[in-house]
Amino acid sequence: MAWIQLRIHTHRDNADLLGDLLMDQGSLSITYEDGQDEPIFEPKLGETPLWQDTVMIALFDAGTDLAPTIEFLESMPFLGKGFNHKIEQVEDKDWIREWMDSFHPIQFGSRLWICPSWREIPDPTAVNVILDPGLAFGTGTHPTTALCLEWLDSLDLSNQEVIDFGCGSGILAIAAIKLGAKKVTGVDIDYQAIDASKANAERNDVVDKLALYLPEDQPANLQADVLVANILAGPLKELAPLIAEKVKIGGKLALSGLLQEQAQEVSDFYSQWFIMDPVSNKEDWSRLTGIRK
């Protein structure tokens, strides 16, 4: 089945109303895009911010006559006659197959590979983590996850205890186990992340070495030789004393989820507890590492 999509440029203040109007006109779905390459940083809890110049994309059945819809929208004062829009035909595809074809095994460092379950493992002798994209958790494609995976690959984790602080999919925790860690503890505020981490650990046959906790359930005095936290700059600063006390003296720390312009400030803050290394960057993102004093 083919589709028609109507693309409309609008101000974010009008997005909710326009979305309702489009649904009333028979749109099957509404999606949003950035109209002017405007970054959005760290939304507050419960917020779903939009770009100032937002492109709204309304999907309709291929047989829909959009002329009445355009005429109706032109009567809206916030749009007006000749408003900025475009009508496009969308080719019918096997979208699930298209989506699956877009994911390939990725190598991180010298030993580690992250592989979707439907792909052939490139190097059976390497350290392979089987992980499928799903939910809103890391699969290695984002620069911050890649920075953390590369760092873990560079370490000798033999007989080390590791904490994955903000474990998400469990990708970092599972990689640490596969790279030799004797025990890994994953902590996350989202019970869905705990469930995702457990499912991925079971798929990789490492569930016996992984303990998973919500913050309120984690053991008292939890400490490790290595801690990795791929979250955001705000929580990293707010939780710095807690994170620091979880790393043994002489232990190793990696922090990511930071934009390059945020990295130095966070590094300076953590220098109270850690001997910090130079910042490592990938695209617009940074990773901080250090040794516990």
Swiss-Prot record:
One family name in Pfam for this protein: PrmA
CDD domains in UniProt: AdoMet_MTases
GO cellular component: cytosol
InterPro entries cross-referenced by the UniProt entry: Ribosomal_L11_MeTrfase_PrmA (IPR050078), Ribosomal_PrmA_MeTrfase (IPR004498), SAM-dependent_MTases_sf (IPR029063)
Biological process (GO), any one: methylation
Gene3D superfamilies tied to this protein: Vaccinia Virus protein VP39
Recorded catalytic activity of this chain's protein: L-lysyl-[protein] + 3 S-adenosyl-L-methionine = N(6),N(6),N(6)-trimethyl-L-lysyl-[protein] + 3 S-adenosyl-L-homocysteine + 3 H(+)
Cellular compartment(s): Cytoplasm
Amino-acid biosynthesis listed as a keyword: no
SUPFAM superfamilies: S-adenosyl-L-methionine-dependent methyltransferases
PANTHER family reported in the protein's UniProt record: ELECTRON TRANSFER FLAVOPROTEIN BETA SUBUNIT LYSINE METHYLTRANSFERASE
Described purpose of this protein according to its UniProt entry: Methylates ribosomal protein L11.
Family: Belongs to the methyltransferase superfamily. PrmA family.
NCBIfam families per UniProt: prmA (TIGR00406)
Protein name (record): Ribosomal protein L11 methyltransferase
